């Protein structure tokens, strides 16, 4: 263990505060004295034994520090030399003698006089001390070699010192430390502790210098590389100049391409101006890269190239029939468009919007249109887009700016007249960066899109030859102004017969090929496909049907592989997929026919609803409890549906006696109406007659027919108003096995849109009033109650207009 013994002494000396420097013992330091108090202290020392106590002040900005603003530990120094300067200041050279700690300070005729205590330590030598001295010496050698601020003589002088205290002070004085770190070292009186601390500081400083040297080396290499590249580029330019080629030829090539691009006059003028700027720029500058990118984009966009259109209606009809089954209205509209193109020389592009549930073929229709017309096809997905710059691009002032997706897709198409699909146009949103749907207003307006301006290109670009096709699941999320610019064509879901044909013509072949099978290994029969449609999928489109066909094919593929490897010797040579085989492969049915076990029930009726995924059945339940006429409505219903329930309740109360219900029934009863699947939001007025029928059934105790569905809005006077989505609703009823439906009389005009398969198999009742609804929907006829005081009895089936006043 390293040890040292202390002996102390007290002295009284003139004191001088110093700034931005810490004086160590054995250290020769010159500095200038200018403060009046410091000059007096210096003169006092010079008049005596030339010894003065120097201590660093805490804050160098203070001109006349107080004793408590000066560090308490400083150094007693000898004044070696003193020289008075012409400006009145004194330049002195001092040598540190020993460190001392202030005991007390007195103000003595304009300067400080301090009583200080010195501490002398006697160090016991030994191998541990020798090892510490050797370590510090070695570290200091490394430090001097790494540092550019110390010379070799300093290192030699330090190495020759064998006294630990003197070595610590010599090394500490030469380290690049802060004032605080040097003061900390000065305040350590024990030489062994001080030397140990110096060793720690040397380790840290060497690490810093190593990191600094690594960084400097990396920077130097990069600079050398940049200088080398610059030199080589200049040399290449000189060689090319000598050969008569080079940058000039590149500028000439760009100029030729601009002239041949077929740009508008405005765009060509802007391109030429940018080319002139590029010519005057240094080739290695960042701005030249920006200009070059801009010119590349201007030249990449198709200005005059057009696809040669196919205007043969028979060919187009054949393509559409081959790719899609059904969808007659859409096919007619596309063929009408082609007929117009054939008759008119320069017609404007069309803007169609396909609206329908998922999986009915909206996106694939766009590809078929491109194929039928001989045009290129590009697709831009708008789902989740909420930045206007996605459509119009960023201005060139931004770093990394690019054109918007419209221009990027036109570049991808390579022609002025592609079929441009704007997919999921109903799923755009907006935020602080703008509204992309507002940017689309210009794109989809035939009166404006011939001069569409992208923020990046900043020139007018003609989109009038583009055939725009938008797709959406619902219309209500699309802004009205955008709806107004598009011709909306609605795609309903497919009937079971249509799904059967689609599966046989397209899906089965596609999945057999995708799984590596062939017609010799698997055979889908009609009852097998029908089983998949009825019991494993329940959708408006055919996506899930294709998925289930794929599941069957994969399971058969596994059986084929096992049979070939000898693992499954019982596997048949050809898998026949029929109604019995499907459950073996896919497990139990996922969906059951809801009507098979459904009986007529009191207070429960089946309604029809329309959602963005197609038509759906809606069960409405009503129950009675003792109470005071409170109406509770549950099932996550929207405001419109809740108001429909209130209207239905008011109608029942106003017609209570004629419906066989006591007039004051509500005084003693509470009604609770519930629509199951409470987690799913429901809204709309079309459940009005279903709600009224359910309430009437619960109050009269007459069951509602279970094999019947209904839809229609109700008024307070009992009239039945028309609804929307009739085709989808009837298809949902047909899909669930319900073959009888009640609907408003005014919806009879929609019958031509209903598939023939549904009209032939379903019995449709068109009604005008609730009385007609109740006659059809309830199991038996209502018997009216006699009205007290009335001359004539009220008959059941009384017209809805004659309401009872309360």
From Swiss-Prot:
Keyword Protease part of the UniProt annotation: yes
Pfam family, one: LON_substr_bdg
Transmembrane spans: none
Keywords: ATP-binding, Cytoplasm, Hydrolase, Nucleotide-binding, Protease, Serine protease, Stress response
A GO MF label: ATP-dependent peptidase activity
EC number of the protein: 3.4.21.53
Protein name, per record: Lon protease
Higher taxonomy: Bacteria, Pseudomonadati, Acidobacteriota, Terriglobia, Bryobacterales
